[in-house]
Design a protein with these regions (language model features):
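Rhodanese-like catalytic fold shared by cysteine-dependent sulfurtransferases
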Residues: 1-128, 132-267
Length: 267
């Protein structure tokens, strides 16, 4: 977002959208447009709002900031308004909607006793304990053994955090909205054993900071780090990429025709 964003856009991580939308857009008839750099995260964010029963018209911006730039529109850089600075969200109805959605998708609502039991079985059955809140919330205090996995990024890059599709995945938050929303998406992605805390049950934080060995660079990147090529250069690069892809698609057929590689059964 700081490198490049559409003027007037509010920075809101995808995993926080449903949690914070009523504070950001209190009017139920105001259209909502979600964008990212390209397409996948904006689709995820927009569909999350729709799945949660938001009454507003929700749109995903096709091709995101890259498409905006290629169309000749200006992009803003640097810090801008951030969703979590807009005030404390009202979570009641969103919590109920998120819970219903997660359960409908096949996720499980568990309590502290079940989690304690699963911790005891972790040597034999993999347990991924993931805190889906913002990184700064995680650093301020989190459950022992939990790993920071912000909800939107977790859905986008789930294999960065979850090593086994059949392992147990328990998602944690402190609001009862973000964890079940992320759980609904992990179930739709095919993860088999996904759970969240029942009734938005909060776990008391007993650790602060980052896990040992995890590198955290303080500070924020600014406009000096941004690089957006001019449209002519971007077009040239894209054409070169398209040509490369087309050549790679044709390569296997050419190999079959030319017989470049062959092995006898004994080799």
């Amino acid at each position: 977002y700081q490198r490049a964003h559409i003027p007037g856009a509010i920075s809101c991580p995808g995993g926080d959208l449903v949690y914070r939308i009523d504070t950001l857009v209190p009017d139920p008839v105001t259209p909502i447009v979600i964008n990212c750099a390209g397409r996948s995260r904006s689709i995820y964010g927009a569909q999350s709002l729709i799945n949660a029963g938001i009454s507003n018209c929700v749109y995903s911006l096709e091709k995101g900031t890259v498409g905006w730039w290629r169309a000749g529109h200006a992009l803003a850089q640097g810090a801008g308004p951030r969703a979590h600075e807009a005030g404390l969200p009202a979570t009641g109805k969103r919590r109920d909607a998120a819970r219903r959605l997660a359960l409908a998708c096949g996720a499980h609502a568990i309590d502290r006793d079940i989690l304690k039991h699963w911790r005891g079985e972790a040597e034999n059955i993999s347990l991924h304990l993931l805190d889906v809140r913002l990184p700064e919330e995680y650093e301020a205090g989190h459950t022992f053994g939990a790993v920071s996995a912000p909800g939107g990024q977790l859905v986008e890059c789930s294999d960065d955090w979850i090593g086994l599709r059949g392992g147990r995945v328990v998602l944690l938050d402190d609001d009862g909205v973000r964890a079940p929303m992320a759980a609904s998406w992990l179930r739709q992605l095919g993860y088999e054993n996904v759970a969240f805390m029942a009734d938005g049950e909060e776990l008391e934080p007993d650790e602060t900071g980052l896990p040992a060995g995890e590198v955290h660079e303080p500070g924020e990147s600014g406009p000096e780090d941004a690089y957006y090529p001019d449209c002519a250069t971007l077009e040239e690069d894209l054409l070169a990429s398209e040509h490369y892809v087309l050549e790679q698609i044709k390569l296997p057929e050419q190999v079959r025709r030319d017989g470049l590689v062959s092995f006898s059964p004994h080799e």
